[in-house]
Swiss-Prot record:
Subcellular location: Cell membrane
Entry keyword Transcription: no
Topological category with respect to the lipid bilayer: Peripheral membrane protein
Protein function: Component of the A-type ATP synthase that produces ATP from ADP in the presence of a proton gradient across the membrane.
SUPFAM superfamilies (UniProt xref): V-type ATPase subunit E-like
Molecular function as annotated in GO: ATP binding; proton-transporting ATP synthase activity, rotational mechanism; proton-transporting ATPase activity, rotational mechanism
A single GO cellular-component term on record: plasma membrane
Keywords, comma-separated and alphabetical: ATP synthesis, Cell membrane, Hydrogen ion transport, Ion transport, Membrane, Transport
UniProt-listed InterPro entries: ATPase_E_C, ATPase_V1_Esu
Natural source organism: Metallosphaera sedula (strain ATCC 51363 / DSM 5348 / JCM 9185 / NBRC 15509 / TH2)
Family stated for the protein in its record: Belongs to the V-ATPase E subunit family.
Gene that encodes the chain: atpE
Pfam families in the cross-refs: vATP-synt_E
Name by which UniProt lists this protein: A-type ATP synthase subunit E
Subunit structure: Has multiple subunits with at least A(3), B(3), C, D, E, F, H, I and proteolipid K(x).
Length: 192
């Protein structure tokens, strides 16, 4: 026969074993729950960090693009400045061109070819006398007017038909300069 104490010991051992198993299960469930929560938090914050990194990259790319455009504008502005300096230098050297014999012969040739009686000839203020002498030499009846916008050459207005022919140095210089701009840019900046 088993004594009460032994029986109590067996019952206690049996209950301890059941309690131990239950505690092990509870501990395992708690660890799984903690692991799931940790994984969930990790996924959430990893996604948030990825989102923040992506947003920061987009902001950096946007700023880089803005700065690239700003640099290109600055470079283009500087190039235009130097091209305009070349143009201004060309305008300043027009005095030499206007004093040349070739220029005077060209001007007279244009008047001889294009002038009609009753025309109005516009020229620069410093060439009025010269143009009047040329017209007188051609025995044509035309009015000569100065135009402060004209740097040289002439504009001939045919009042009877409402037509103006432009042989001014302004137009010629603009056309030649525009056509030579790529070559000038290549010389100045090493570009095509």
């Amino acid at each position: 026969m088993v004594s009460v104490e032994e029986l109590m010991g067996q019952v206690i051992d049996s209950e301890m074993e059941v309690i131990s198993k239950e505690l092990s299960k509870a501990l395992e469930e708690a660890l799984n729950l903690v692991k799931q929560k940790r994984d969930s938090v990790e996924r959430t914050y990893t996604a948030k960090m990825q989102e923040m990194v992506t947003k920061a990259k987009e902001e950096i790319e946007g700023e880089r693009a803005r700065l690239d455009i700003e640099v290109k504008r600055a470079v283009l502005g500087e190039k235009n400045y130097w091209l305009n300096k070349v143009y201004e230098g060309t305008i300043k050297s027009l005095g030499t061109v206007k004093n040349s014999q070739g220029y005077k012969q060209g001007l007279e040739s244009v008047l001889k070819r294009e002038l009609r009686d009753g025309s109005i000839v516009y020229c620069s203020e410093d060439e009025v006398d010269q143009v009047q002498k040329m017209i007188k030499g051609l025995k044509a009846k035309a009015e000569v007017r100065s135009d402060p916008k004209i740097m040289g050459g002439v504009k001939i207005q045919y009042s009877d038909v409402g037509l103006v022919r432009d042989y001014s140095l302004n137009l010629i210089l603009d056309q030649v300069f525009e056509s030579l701009k790529p070559k000038i840019a290549e010389i100045l900046f090493g570009e095509m």
